């Protein structure tokens, strides 16, 4: 469950006060032009003292609206798939699948905003343009496990270059993307998932 909570910080991770409205709109416009995105990623996690605690790698696929496939292949094999309605998290080592409503994830992490156009969700966060991209932080009163999300775009319309997530404990997760394919058709099956036979299923999609 700890691995799932950590992943939700990121995925369920990418909104604005009036003073930052222009920056928020600029980020939304840039994300809106990203109809689909597929890449490999390398991950580095450091604690609040700056000490490395984990390194990993995997693949990511995003498609408008609200479709995500995130597979970590090292050090553990885990899969996170959202078809826009339901979200599936598969931990192959634990042989467990967790099923959630995608809409419930948006309130806890700004990452889902990468594929969301819902103004009500964006209003929960402040966006500030930086020298390297954009910084997203939850507004006061918004319950989020993410303290800050920094987004860097690649040049020449090559999509995302880097995401850096800082959680409430001060832990920092950095994701660097490479071999990206931008705005190319992705098969619908990319965002579909059928639990393997014999695995434990924890279905939280009905709010139980």
Swiss-Prot record:
N-terminal signal peptide: 1-21
Record field: compositional bias (Acidic residues): 199-208
Cellular component, GO, one term: outer membrane-bounded periplasmic space
CDD domains attached to this UniProt entry: LolA
Localization: Periplasm
Pfam families referenced in this protein's UniProt entry, alphabetically: LolA (PF03548)
The keyword Protein transport is assigned to this record: yes
Gene Ontology BP terms: lipoprotein localization to outer membrane; lipoprotein transport
Oligomer status and interactors: Monomer.
UniProt keyword annotation of NADP present: no
Superkingdom as given in the UniProt entry: Bacteria
Membership in a protein family: Belongs to the LolA family.
InterPro entries, alphabetized: LolA/LolB/LppX (IPR029046), OM_lipoprot_carrier_LolA-like (IPR004564), OM_lipoprot_carrier_LolA_Pbac (IPR018323)
Name of the protein this chain belongs to: Outer-membrane lipoprotein carrier protein
Source lineage: Bacteria, Pseudomonadati, Pseudomonadota, Gammaproteobacteria, Alteromonadales
Region annotated Disordered, chain positions: 188-208
UniProt function note: Participates in the translocation of lipoproteins from the inner membrane to the outer membrane. Only forms a complex with a lipoprotein if the residue after the N-terminal Cys is not an aspartate (The Asp acts as a targeting signal to indicate that the lipoprotein should stay in the inner membrane).
Keywords: Chaperone, Periplasm, Protein transport, Signal, Transport
């Amino acid at each position: 469950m700890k691995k799932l909570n950590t992943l939700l910080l990121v995925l369920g991770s990418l909104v604005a006060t009036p003073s930052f409205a222009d920056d928020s709109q600029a980020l939304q416009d840039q994300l809106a032009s990203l109809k689909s995105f597929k890449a490999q990623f390398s991950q580095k996690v450091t604690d609040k003292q700056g000490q490395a605690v984990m390194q990993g790698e995997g693949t990511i696929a995003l498609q408008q609206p609200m479709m995500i496939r995130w597979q970590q292949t090292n050090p553990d094999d885990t899969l996170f798939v959202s078809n826009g309605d339901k979200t599936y998290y598969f931990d192959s080592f634990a042989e467990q699948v967790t099923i959630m409503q995608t809409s419930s994830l948006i309130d806890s992490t700004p990452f889902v905003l990468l594929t969301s156009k819902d103004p009500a969700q964006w209003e929960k966060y402040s966006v500030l343009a930086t020298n390297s991209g954009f910084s997203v932080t939850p507004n006061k009163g918004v319950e989020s496990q993410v303290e800050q999300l920094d987004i860097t775009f690649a040049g020449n319309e090559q999509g995302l270059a880097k995401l850096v997530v800082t959680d409430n404990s001060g832990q920092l997760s950095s994701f660097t993307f490479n071999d990206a394919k931008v705005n190319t058709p992705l098969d619908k099956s990319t965002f579909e998932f059928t639990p393997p036979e014999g695995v434990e299923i924890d279905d939280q999609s009905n709010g139980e």
